[in-house]
Structure formats: structure tokens, C-alpha cells
Amino acid sequence: MSITAERKEALIKEYARVEGDTGSPEVQVAILTERIVNLTEHFKTHAKDNHSRRGLLRLVNKRRSLLDYVKNNDKDRYSSLIARLGLRK
């Protein structure tokens, strides 16, 4: 259900703006998206796990907040980020 250290490191390398960048909004959104995808898969087999569903909602809200921050500060970064993550249709 949680992401492995190797997968997290790969996401950091892929979305980092500079070498060693772990805290930029792009990296945070990528990690949150991976966790959201994992939880979504979890709910396909554990539909009544309401405790984890609350955690999923918190992750989605945190990601939305970070995406709003990126959108307000740099629309080009926002557009490229959602395209890379495949979040919007």
C-alpha cells in the first residue's frame, strides 16, 4: 500500500527541479499522486475500509492545495506538471 524507497527516489529524480530537490511542489505532488493511486487500488479489494478512505481524502486535498499553489505562481509549470502526471483529461 505504501510506496517503496526505490520508487520514491525515482519519483524525486524524475520531478526534481534541481539535483537534491525533494521539497518542491512538483515532487510532493508526484509522491502524493503515487500514494493516491496505491490507495485507489487498495479500495478495489477493501471497499469498506473507511479509515483509509479518510486518509485518501486528506491526500487528495493536500495534492489539490499544492496544485493550486503551483497554478497561482506559474501556469506553465502547472500545465506541464498535470500533463506529465496525467491528472486532467
UniProtKB/Swiss-Prot annotation:
Gene3D superfamilies: 6.10.250.3130, S15/NS1, RNA-binding (1.10.287.10). GO terms for molecular function: rRNA binding; structural constituent of ribosome. It comes from the Bacteria. Disulfide bonds: none annotated. Keywords: Ribonucleoprotein, Ribosomal protein, RNA-binding, rRNA-binding. PROSITE patterns: RIBOSOMAL_S15 (PS00362). InterPro entries: Ribosomal_uS15 (IPR000589), Ribosomal_uS15_bac-type (IPR005290), uS15_NS1_RNA-bd_sf (IPR009068). Pfam families: Ribosomal_S15 (PF00312). CDD domains: Ribosomal_S15p_S13e. One of its GO terms (cellular component) is cytosolic small ribosomal subunit. GO terms for biological process: translation. Belongs to the universal ribosomal protein uS15 family. Part of the 30S ribosomal subunit. Forms a bridge to the 50S subunit in the 70S ribosome, contacting the 23S rRNA. PANTHER family: RIBOSOMAL PROTEIN S15, BACTERIAL AND ORGANELLAR, SMALL RIBOSOMAL SUBUNIT PROTEIN US15M. HAMAP family: Ribosomal_uS15_B. One of the primary rRNA binding proteins, it binds directly to 16S rRNA where it helps nucleate assembly of the platform of the 30S subunit by binding and bridging several RNA helices of the 16S rRNA. This is Small ribosomal subunit protein uS15.
